[in-house]
């Protein structure tokens, strides 16, 4: 997605050899126009798969996920990183390691929000090692539902996440695919959409 790549080049900041900071439009401040376009592109990409729910993990995946759900006209669910007192029965959980935060979290979705009839599109802001999406696939399968696609806003293609998810049999669509970081600059591979 050329527009996204342009924003990364103009406003993204490379930190070290593996981190891209995109606080200006995705991970802290949200550019709703860009997110709306991202949602439209994901919806177009997966329009023929009978998606019934969009699922993400809080927090930075919520904006692109909600705009994707809007474009598909389906509900959006976000997995919570902290259990609250209203989540009492039938909670679906998975352990997820965050590459950026370097911490393992238990993420959860309340029972009853997913069913065996659901065809789920996973949306996330970044793909690095694939652990967040893998955890969501686990939760979706616990409900008897089917993960039919994974939409990634920014993929770090130099890390193993895509291969892990494709090995699980789920199609991955990334709107920006980073080949590598070199002296603070970003090099891209061809995006999927």
Swiss-Prot record:
It is an enzyme of class 2 (transferase). CDD domains: PRTases_typeI. GO terms for biological process: purine ribonucleoside salvage; xanthine metabolic process; XMP salvage. Its EC number is 2.4.2.22. Pfam families: Pribosyltran. Keywords: Cytoplasm, Glycosyltransferase, Purine salvage, Transferase. Homodimer. This is Xanthine phosphoribosyltransferase.
